[in-house]
Design a protein with these regions (language model features):
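Conserved ABC transporter NBD signature motif
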Residues: 62-70
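Helix-to-loop junction immediately C-terminal to a conserved catalytic motif
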Residues: 54
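Conserved ABC ATPase "signature" region
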Residues: 69-70, 117-134
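ABC ATPase NBD coupling module
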Residues: 17-20, 71-88
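The feature captures the beta-strand-to-loop junction immediately N-terminal to the Walker
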Residues: 39-41
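A short, flexible loop at the N-terminus of ABC-type nucleotide-binding domains that lies
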Residues: 1-6, 12-25
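Short coil-to-helix segment of the ABC ATPase nucleotide-binding domain corresponding to the Q-loop/switch region
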Residues: 98-109
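ABC-type ATPase nucleotide-binding domains, specifically the catalytic core motifs of the NBD
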Residues: 14-16, 107-119, 128
Length: 136
């Protein structure tokens, strides 16, 4: 089963003679449980593709399905909720909030969604990652 699928994904910036096409009708699908690397030269559209697939930016054309939801048709509010619940992006340079401790930075998406964290699961995850002594 495809966990992620995009069809005819196009992203352009600018207009008229200054228009740049960053992605030109890209289609792909990823199966649940698969691992995929996106590689290419600088300026080849890797970051643009990942931003679109993660719902950080909107395509000029095409559709993006995560599970059975076409995220390219969601309102900004619906997309924000969907991203908090279903999408995780790890950037090359992490973007932690310096006024929050490690625990709160990790739990932030759950707290923003109004959910109560599963403390036992969180503690196990922190221990697995070797972060238990850095949480506060």
């Amino acid at each position: 089963m495809d966990i992620l699928r995009c069809t005819n994904l196009t992203k352009t910036y600018g207009r008229g003679g200054g228009m740049i096409t960053a992605l030109d009708h890209v289609s792909l699908s990823l199966e649940r449980g698969s691992f995929t690397a996106v590689v290419g030269a600088s300026g080849s559209g890797k970051s643009t593709l990942l931003h679109l697939l993660g719902g950080v930016d909107r395509p000029t054309e095409g559709s993006i399905y995560i599970e059975d939801t076409d995220i390219s048709t969601l309102t900004l509010e619906q997309l924000a909720i969907f991203r908090r619940r279903k999408v995780g992006i790890v950037y090359q340079f992490y973007n932690l909030i310096p006024t929050l401790n490690v625990r709160k930075n990790i739990l932030l998406p759950i707290l923003l969604d109004g959910e109560k964290p599963d403390e036992a699961r969180f503690e196990k995850l922190a221990a697995t990652l070797g972060l238990s002594d850095r949480l506060t």
